[in-house]
Amino acid sequence: MEFTQVILYTDTDGRARFREQAIPLTEGKPQARLSALMPCGGLQLRMSPVGFRSEFHCTGAPQWLFVLGGMMEIGLQDGSTRLFKPGDHFYSADTLPEGATFDAQWHGHCSRQVGDEPLVTAFVRA
């Protein structure tokens, strides 16, 4: 049994992309499988109003993002988007490559609130 981790990362060309990776659920009991315990550096909650839209940016530090309410769309520089609904998650690790100067036409991702409900998210620092 495994958990699918959606990862937003910086590829070798400096662009943000999505990929998926399996996290094995090898602990716990047959009726409640668990992953290995993962360290974290803190929890932060955010509420974004209807109409929220960010500029392109990179993640400052790797973190899990869990959508608790509303819907969120993540847009990449290649024009692709991915929609996240309540209960969805992704691991945001699209940090600026070392030595690079941020270029809003090349690096990072943007996010926006979708629909008629505020976006409520939880960030868990890795």
Whereabouts are the PLM-identified features?
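Glycine- and acidic-residue-biased ligand/ion/polar-headgroup-sensing regions
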Residues: 60-78, 88
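Short acidic-glycine-tyrosine-enriched beta hairpin
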Residues: 78-96
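Short acidic (Asp/Glu) patches
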Residues: 49-52, 70, 76, 96, ...
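A short glycine-rich, His/Asp/Glu-containing loop-to-beta-strand
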Residues: 12-56, 62, 117-124
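Ubiquitin-like/PB1-type beta-grasp interaction modules and other compact soluble beta-rich domains
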Residues: 61, 80-83, 101-107
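A short hydrophobic beta-strand segment most commonly corresponding to one strand
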Residues: 91, 100-126
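Short acidic, Pro/Gly- and aromatic-enriched capping/linker segments at domain boundaries
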Residues: 1-9, 79
